[in-house]
């Protein structure tokens, strides 16, 4: 017997929140998440009151339980110690794409996004089935980075929608100065520095 415009009252955490029945016999009432978390019984109690043409008042009630999980996941991330064989970017590597690799753990999941920040730019990749990642970073950006440090982060979301982030950083060196070899010829190419007919 509920009618459009009847008042619906929700009770959560000892507080009441009201709304009206809509034309399609539904209702939608905003409840602060903080009150849902704080409610001791984790139960929403609902009631509706309606009055008929004769002035009789009727009330209906219902309740619905729910769960709370506000604990963020804790992913971890580790960058491999050397980004090249010797952990030094040389002049050749400065012109290449350098694969930066590492592993994740904790609550990190396959498919989570890993973000590397180098030279103020971000480069992203996904966690693979073996909990590793490999992300190409231009050697030029590794050379240009003022701190010569790769900053890595991973973000993961649990089943309840909580978001957790893990971070790590790894330094490296740059040497793009070409070696300068020297060579000298002996002053005399023969004993007297003269090529004769025999020589």
Name every feature range the model reports, one short phrase each.
Residues 1-199:
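Extracellular glycosylation-rich, acidic/polar low-complexity regions of adhesion-
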């Amino acid at each position: 017997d509920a009618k459009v415009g009847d008042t619906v009252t929700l009770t959560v955490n000892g507080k009441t929140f009201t709304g009206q029945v809509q034309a399609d016999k539904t209702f939608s009432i905003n409840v602060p998440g903080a009150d849902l978390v704080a409610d001791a019984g984790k139960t929403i109690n609902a009631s509706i009151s309606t009055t008929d043409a004769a002035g009789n008042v009727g009330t209906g009630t219902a309740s619905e339980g729910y769960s709370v999980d506000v604990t963020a996941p804790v992913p971890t991330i580790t960058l491999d110690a050397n980004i090249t064989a010797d952990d030094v970017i040389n002049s050749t590597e400065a012109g290449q794409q350098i694969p930066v690799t590492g592993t994740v753990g904790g609550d990190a999941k396959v498919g989570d996004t890993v973000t590397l920040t180098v030279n103020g730019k971000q480069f992203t990749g996904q966690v693979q089935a073996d909990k590793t990642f490999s992300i190409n970073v231009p050697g030029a950006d590794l050379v240009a980075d003022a701190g010569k440090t790769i900053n890595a982060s991973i973000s993961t979301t649990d089943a309840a929608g909580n978001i957790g982030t893990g971070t790590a950083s790894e330094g490296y060196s740059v040497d793009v100065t070409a070696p300068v070899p020297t060579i000298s010829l002996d002053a005399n190419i023969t004993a007297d520095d003269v090529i004769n007919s025999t020589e």
